[in-house]
Amino acid sequence: MEWWSMTPTEVLKKLRTEERTGLSENEAQKRLETDGRNRTEQGEGKKSFRRRFLAQFDDFMILLLIGAAVASVAISYWNGEKDFLDAAIILAIVVLNAFLGVLQESRAEKALEALKALSAPKASVLRGGEEKEIPAEEVVQGDILLLAAGDYICADGRILENQGLKTEESAITGEALAIEKEEGVLAEKTLPSDRKNMVLAGSYVLAGRGTVAVTATGMATEIGQIAALLAEQEERETPLQKKLGETGRLLGMGALIICGIIFGMGLLRRQPPFPMFMTSVSLAVAAIPEGLPAIVTIVLAIGMQRMARKNTIIRRLPAVETLGSAEVICSDKTGTLTQNRMKVTRLAAIGKGLEQDEEKRRFILTLFTLCNDVKRQGTKIIGEPTEKALAEAAEEGGVSLKGLWEEMPRIGEVPFSSERKLMTTVHPSGGKWISVTKGAPDVLLEKCTRCLDGGRQAVFDGRRKSEARLKNGEMAANALRVVAVAFREWDEEPLFFTAEELERDLVFAGMAGMMDPPRPEAQAAVEICQKAGIRPVMITGDHALTAQAIAAELGIYRAGDTVLTGQELEQMSDEALERAAEDCTVFARVSPAHKVRIVKAFQKEGRVVAMTGDGVNDAPALKAADIGCAMGKNGTEVAKGAADMILMDDNFATIVEAVREGRGIYENIRKAVHFLLSSNIGEIMTIFVAMCFGWATPLLPIQLLWVNLVTDSLPAIALGVDPADADSMEQPPRKGNSLFSDGMVSRIALEGAMIGMLALLAFGIGHIYFDEEGAYITGRTMAFAVLSLSQLIHAFNMRSEHSLFRISPLGNPMLLLALFIGCLMQIGVIMVLPLAEIFKVCPLNGTEWLIVGALALTPLPVVELEKLCDRRRRKK
């Protein structure tokens, strides 16, 4: 339908909706059920259980194991034997492993989907006459969208009202140009690129405001099949997953070579070829950590959910890895370091006696109320904190907001922009017109040629300008945020509502000073940062004196630090900025464009940088930073789309908590990797050493596969949810350290060798002291039990680099549960006779269990001693 060629009235009639009230909730729900959710379907969609299950077998080692089981059946059948039990057990374990793989994959996917839903875009619509914020997926045809600067446009629509609306449609056109919109009727044959009375899904609002009737949603939009912000699917591997995948493949090759050597040695020692082949294949399957990337995904997803409960939504998995190595946090001041609850504490104007001049005070407050975007909802004033504070001050000063807005409605505006640092509105005024401009004093004063002095207008000469600047400086020095207001009277309605037309030859009226006190928790968070080797930096559009005063109160600014302003940045080369950034903790009067330079200056020093932002123009800085942090409450959808993480409470302390969690998650992944690799090396060592010395095979193929099943998944995942060490924020950032740094490789090798030696010792004791001559069943049973149980016990060693006596044994209930289930399963296959027969083991007596228990517990004291030596070495 050619919506662009219809009048707004015709569009509303066709859509069966009302401009002032929108759809009712019931009607919107009906349309949602009929038309479906507002999203573009993308990719293959969710895999079925069958596809997921079959995908688990798409692995060379698993296929080799199945082939070995089939060969076992064929050989048994060829030899006229009826014993297919080994093959059946191997296949059963393979199938059980596949089910566990599907379960892990499903859990990770559900967790990631839940997190995507939390960070999905929102839309402001009229429903039943009330403005509501709803998930963008719930927008339907006929909804009335209310657009403002920074909003993500989630549906195609026809513009009904337009107030300086400009959009960026690069997601559709490929060109990042600002497109000025209009509301007039266009010809039917107007090209898509010229339909300026339409907005398109996948674009966003650069400036201005608008009211739009939704004409198409989901697959019916122009963007159609193109992947836009709303349906963003990020399935790329994270750097850590890639690294682990490569590590796994390397270890896999090593395991295959060792298993090949074991097979060859077995043949040289005249061992039966087929049992040796089965042992080698089973060992390879058990020893290769093919589940590492999947376990890491689960650990990351669980960590992300935990962070979501603490008001941090992670949008991209790599952000979790990067968080732990953050060295600089560049934070906005307002709302992040402060309470975002401004209160006007002082008014100033040219001349004296403002405190006694009630009429002039009321006039200044009236101007601030006219040039203001706040709204009243019941008894509450809703809006941006600065504007809300001005409106509240006006009400307290006797100005009726409702009466003023009805008497002097807004007929035009030039919206605020970070570049101009000004906002202007136009109103009728007693048969004439008045334009009101408010904004940064240093910018606004330059636009003024006259001023109010006493009860009259006067020339804004050098003396009066100096007086205004002095009063501005005094308020700023007292950490007040200062906003100035000016006006211009018009005999006729202005022809053009542009900054060039309206923001000149103004009459300076006065200034308001307001305070946004620091958040109580921000000071403690700054202190934690500094202990953790993280440098907090304040970035603000406020006056330098205001910023410095707040930063000093928070502990960000210290004696010897410097403060840089946007004006100084403009005059600096990139090299000079890099040098200046070394001592700078406060950047004041900066624009969003400056933020990118600040980020790059720190990055050139080799620092990992986190940056906060909330506006449309903050998006480049958020993308440039190693970790982009968007604001959840006051952030635009564009900023959220560019960010790696979203702070749902806009709080600096939440960033610090996220860094703590990020460090904990990274350490937990290290723990899981350490545990898996040391356990797998233990399994290889058990068989390899036995072959080297010409001993009988300590473990049978099905026993190796069972150990792999019991010890690999549950304990590793349980380690992934371990609470972070209490001193995690007292350590310096990782700064690109390898996953295997701090001697981890040697510890893995030594601990793996220890586990292997314990299993061999159990095999030797069982065979020599408890087996009948020529039998190995007790020795194998004891080796089987020790190998499995010692790995489960060893998981506790992974919990901390500190002594286990320093942490709570009940601190990780999931690990206790994994240990209980693993021990129960292991003891069950030995002590339950039918299972013992299947696994070719025998029930153990009390003495044998005591020996098994003593050997299985050995990793605890040995690793405690290793940790003690390591701590002493580090101190030296």
Residue ranges and their predicted role:
Residues M1-P732, N737-F740, A753, I768, ...:
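Conserved cytosolic headpiece of P-type ATPases
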Residues L85, A775-M782:
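Membrane-interface starts of transmembrane alpha-helices
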Residues T711, I755-G756, R780-A795:
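Generic alpha-helical transmembrane segments
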Residues R747-A762:
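Alpha-helical transmembrane segments of multi-pass integral membrane proteins
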Residues F763-F770, A775:
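Long hydrophobic segments that form regular secondary structure
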